[in-house]
From Swiss-Prot:
Keywords: Cell membrane, Membrane, Sugar transport, Transmembrane, Transmembrane helix, Transport. GO terms for molecular function: ABC-type maltose transporter activity. Residues 76-268 form the ABC transmembrane type-1 domain. Belongs to the binding-protein-dependent transport system permease family. This is Galactooligosaccharides transport system permease protein GanQ. The complex is composed of two ATP-binding proteins (MsmX), two transmembrane proteins (GanP and GanQ) and a solute-binding protein (GanS). It comes from the Bacteria. InterPro entries: BP-dep_ABC_trans_perm (IPR050901), MetI-like (IPR000515), MetI-like_sf (IPR035906). Involved in galactan degradation. Part of the ABC transporter complex GanPQS involved in the uptake of galactooligosaccharides. Responsible for the translocation of the substrate across the membrane. Induction: Repressed by the transcriptional regulator GanR and induced by galactobiose. Also repressed by glucose. SUPFAM superfamilies: MetI-like. GO terms for cellular component: plasma membrane. Disulfide bonds: none annotated.
Amino acid sequence: MLADMKVRRYIRLLFSYLLLAFMAVIIVYPLLWTAGASFNPGNSLISTSIIPKHPTFDHYKELFAGKESLQYVQWYVNSMKISLFTMAGSLLCVTFTAYAFSRFRFKGRKYALTLFLLLQMIPQFSALIALFVLAQILGMINSHWLLILLYIGGLIPMNTYLMKGYMDSIPMDLDESAKIDGASSTRIFFQIILPLSKPMAAVVAMNGFTGPLGDFVLSSTILRTPESYTLPVGLFNLVNDVMGASYTTFAAGALLISIPVAVIFIMLQKNFVSGLTAGGTKG
């Protein structure tokens, strides 16, 4: 009996490791292929390999050569601007909104939370025509600020629900003790609730940064001129030309997108992991 239990446990453990190894291959292999393609000479992917026989930095040099048809530096700056402002704006809006839902009781509170969940079920592309018409009416075609506001609005519902669940796990006794000492709701938020909510705030910040950085659908709808493009839109147009497509240069540009994401993740790694775990178990 004991031997059978050990065998079953060994089989489950072996299956778990095989599953993890399979998932690791699925995740890592495309990254290695992209990295290898960026160092391969030529523009085609047919003759590329993960380990280039004759590696070259020509594609990276081409990105920063300042060609009119390849404004990579400008696209990079645009993406960083949009992502950073979206991250800051969404973090501010989400924390304030979640605090209100977590600590105050008002009419329509439960309906608003339900509405937040329902909004997540509506596909983004279903509102593209309305958003484009709105941008035209406001005269904000090619406007990064309109794009930032749209991203912030899209991030608020789900992230607010996550943050609210985390704030609910913070004991109300802390608020009551602070109120006895004469602290206002604003002071309680900034000096007690917000510092204790840093783990989940890191998750919200990461979502706010990576979402706009990798978005193509909405940004391609609002941004129409090359100088206003973000990286996904600019790199797509780089390979959209059938005759002049440069897939290896695209690979080099795509690889560089991961640098700011990696930097932000490393900075927030400790809080990010604990906050993600807490968001799934608390509230």
